[in-house]
From Swiss-Prot:
Catalysed conversion reaction: [thioredoxin]-dithiol + NADP(+) = [thioredoxin]-disulfide + NADPH + H(+)
Cofactor(s) the protein requires to work: FAD
Coiled coil: none
Protein name: Thioredoxin reductase
UniProt-listed InterPro entries: FAD/NAD-bd_sf (IPR036188), FAD/NAD-binding_dom (IPR023753), Ferredoxin-NADP_redctase_2 (IPR050097), Pyr_nucl-diS_OxRdtase_2_AS (IPR008255)
GO terms under cellular component: cytoplasm
Pfam families xrefs: Pyr_redox_2 (PF07992)
Disulfide cysteine pairs (residue numbers): 134-137
Entries under Gene3D superfamilies matching the protein: FAD/NAD(P)-binding domain
Organism: Ureaplasma parvum serovar 3 (strain ATCC 700970)
Main subcellular localisation: cytoplasm
């Protein structure tokens, strides 16, 4: 075969993919990363990280860069393209990118997740015109303005706290009677003067002219409708798997779209592994993502050794 054959191609440069790259490279594998956006994954879009062992508190972009820098120092290359398709080519795996095709012995799918949308009136119309899914990216545009955050988990509460340092007022809207977020975060939000919290509220419409001007929500108990005048909304209501076309390999779970693996992070196809938030599991944290990446890399190495490559 004239084309270069990699030992391992990692799809995704979030914590799982970067951790896998470190262990794969240190074990002697010829490894390359494919990333369609930027290194660090969702960490790079997080205002602050306070639950990663060994680091009390660090801005998300800084932690993402430290991970990326460690991989660069090992001379691991990153191709900035989308991975469109994975297929089998004899005993190898073929990965079709936007402008080229890679041949590899093993693959780690670490594509992560995408933001879930509300699918309500006005959402698509005002996306990038006031509706955002990244507070650290777009929050500074709304200094001393009124903004809203929709969601009840850690991400929603964390980003509301961050936005409160920028915006004049932050309306934090949950469709549940209480937050799912850590109590420490909820306490901080409750004690932040310019955060107003709403429980049992279902947002059903965004409105405006050229840009977002407000939203409407309904009280799930009284059915009362309230209109809020805001200039930006940040939605954090969960995640959807970021999938790749795998033809008929049946790697992705057709029910929920995530990937089921064994304890070694191997999928239903030998030599194809998965790591991080794309894996079908209950807990998705930075620590669990890096853990998956390490295991996947070590067993990719074991797979190659076992097959006498």
């Amino acid at each position: 075969m004239n084309q270069e054959v990699y030992d391992l191609v990692i799809i995704g440069a979030g914590p799982a993919g970067l951790a896998a790259a470190v262990y794969a490279k240190r074990s002697g594998l010829n490894v390359i990363i494919v990333e369609k956006q930027f290194p660090g994954g969702k960490i790079a879009l997080t205002s602050n990280v306070e639950n990663y062992l060994g680091i009390n508190s660090i801005p998300g972009p800084e932690l993402a860069y430290k991970m990326y820098e460690q991989v660069l120092n090992l001379n691991v290359s990153i191709i900035y393209e989308a991975a469109d398709e994975i297929s089998l080519k004899e005993k190898y795996k073929k990965i079709k990118l936007t402008t080229q095709t890679l041949i590899t012995k093993t693959v780690i799918i670490a594509t992560g997740t995408e933001n879930r949308r509300l699918n309500i009136l006005g959402e698509l119309e005002f996306e990038n015109k006031g509706i955002s899914y990244c507070a650290i990216c777009d929050g500074p545009l709304y200094k001393n303005k009124a903004v809203s955050v929709i969601g009840s988990g850690n991400s929603a509460v964390e980003e509301a706290i961050y936005l409160a340092t920028i915006a004049k007022e932050v309306h934090l809207i949950a469709n549940k009677p209480q937050f799912k977020a850590e109590q420490q975060l909820v306490q901080i939000a409750n004690n932040t003067p310019n955060i107003k919290i709403y429980y049992n509220k279902q947002t059903f419409e965004f409105f405006g002219h050229q840009f977002l001007e407000g939203l409407k929500f309904r009280d799930l108990i009284t059915n009362e409708v309230t209109t809020l005048n805001i200039e930006a909304n940040f939605t954090f209501i969960g995640l959807l798997p970021s999938r790749i076309n795998t033809n008929n390999l049946c790697i992705f779970n057709e029910v929920n779209g995530f990937i089921t693996t064994d304890k070694n992070m191997q999928t239903s196809v030998c030599g194809i592994f998965a790591a991080g938030d794309i894996v079908d599991k209950n807990v998705r944290q930075i620590a669990t993502a890096t853990n998956d990446g390490v295991i996947a890399a070590l067993y990719a190495k074991e797979y190659i050794t076992r097959n006498n490559w």
